[in-house]
């Protein structure tokens, strides 16, 4: 097979790959917009729920043994991490950075509750801290999935299986960068649930809690927590799509550069082949004339 034909086949192969990377970029862009829109649709509700909790907390009597606030076993806490990875790869170092961050902060006796197939597969046969029966998808976060995860987390804390639960996920810092972060889910910290200064549109007067503050708090605290989890899942999903867009954009640009270089090489090879053919034709014609 001629050199020019091989070059042409390579160019066509890279062009096909470039179509795939460009399509993946567009798909991730669409998913990113939808995820952000979904979160914007529900975030006012969870913001209002947080405001409501902050108005209830000051009325709670001190009850250090309550599972939502009690910091048990401070010397050697039974700690779990809710780890939000992706279901798919081809997103640059998105999953690797998150798992590296997790290993740097986790202790040998901690437990990993992993969301996303990439993280689950990476830890399944390599890390005994993975809770294998805990399996959830990271694709297209939903309120129901966040609610189910919240119920599991609260049950494990109430039953005494765990003392602390943290969420580990990737947070978008700006349009170009994102980094892994860790936030505590349970026990709740009263310092971060204090009421903000009242604005002009805020309700005035004392809050009446029926039948009592603890009963009201226990009803709305799980909603607040599943809002935290849904927000982290959505933020993580958006960071994944952003990372994949960056990776696919870089791959598409690299493919363009390769095609340009190969096209130049193909043109030189083709030009040399044509020149050689012309030379052979001229030489053959001269030989015929000499014979005649």
Feature-to-residue mapping (PLM):
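C-terminal beta-strand-loop-alpha-helix "lid" module of Rossmann-like NAD(P)-dependent dehydrogenases
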Residues: 1-292
């Amino acid at each position: 097979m001629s050199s020019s034909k091989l070059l042409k086949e390579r160019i066509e192969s890279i062009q096909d790959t470039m179509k795939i990377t460009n399509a993946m970029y567009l798909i991730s862009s669409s998913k990113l917009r939808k995820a952000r829109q979904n979160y914007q649709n529900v975030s006012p509700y969870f913001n209002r729920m947080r405001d409501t909790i902050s108005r209830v907390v000051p009325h709670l009597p001190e009850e250090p043994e309550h599972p939502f606030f009690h910091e048990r076993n401070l010397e050697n806490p039974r700690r779990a991490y809710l780890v939000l990875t992706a279901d798919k790869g081809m997103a640059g170092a998105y999953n690797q950075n998150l798992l590296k961050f997790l290993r740097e902060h986790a202790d040998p006796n901690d437990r990993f509750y992993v969301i996303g197939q990439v993280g689950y597969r990476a830890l399944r046969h390599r890390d005994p801290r993975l809770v294998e029966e805990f399996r959830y998808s990271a694709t297209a976060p939903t309120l129901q999935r966040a609610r189910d995860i919240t119920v599991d987390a609260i049950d494990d804390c109430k039953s005494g299986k765990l003392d602390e639960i943290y969420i580990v996920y990737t947070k978008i810092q700006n349009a170009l960068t994102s980094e892994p972060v860790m936030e505590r889910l349970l026990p709740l910290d009263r310092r971060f649930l204090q009421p903000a200064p009242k604005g002009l549109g805020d309700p005035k007067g004392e809050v009446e809690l029926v039948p009592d503050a603890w009963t009201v708090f226990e009803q709305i605290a799980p909603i607040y927590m599943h809002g935290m989890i849904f927000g982290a899942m959505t933020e993580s999903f958006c960071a994944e799509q952003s990372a994949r867009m960056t990776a696919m954009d870089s791959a598409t640009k690299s493919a363009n550069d390769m095609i340009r270089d190969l096209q130049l090489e193909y043109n030189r090879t083709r030009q040399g082949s044509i020149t050689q053919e012309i030379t052979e034709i001229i030489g053959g014609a001269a030989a015929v004339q000499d014979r005649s």
